[in-house]
């Protein structure tokens, strides 16, 4: 299904704050790791944010193009196991999760590619897993959304 977005920016994730943002689905398709976001916090410095403050977007998409896993572990839920284990994942195509919340995200760039480290937590009531840590390399990122709604929650604390 083709989606159309009003705002589309490439390689601008350093201007998107993802802590506590909810992701309804993470999956691999068309050589992209796709994050279907319920919302994102678009920082004031983002080239497509016309406001002097960070704003929360509505639903949007983050795509990591030509991704390659450097490290990925999936933590089993402590509710389903007395001795929870970490499960390594090695292929991007194995990444298919629903209802995750970003706890940590950082991006770096070198001469060859971008890299990101992220930790996402799952709702233990709906998942066999507690969360996942992903360290991934990719050629570029694309961030898409339609509207900037309210001022971001953290603007009151700056």
Q: Can you describe what each PLM-predicted range is?
A:
Residues 1-158:
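Surface-exposed, interaction-prone regions used to assemble/regulate multi-protein complexes
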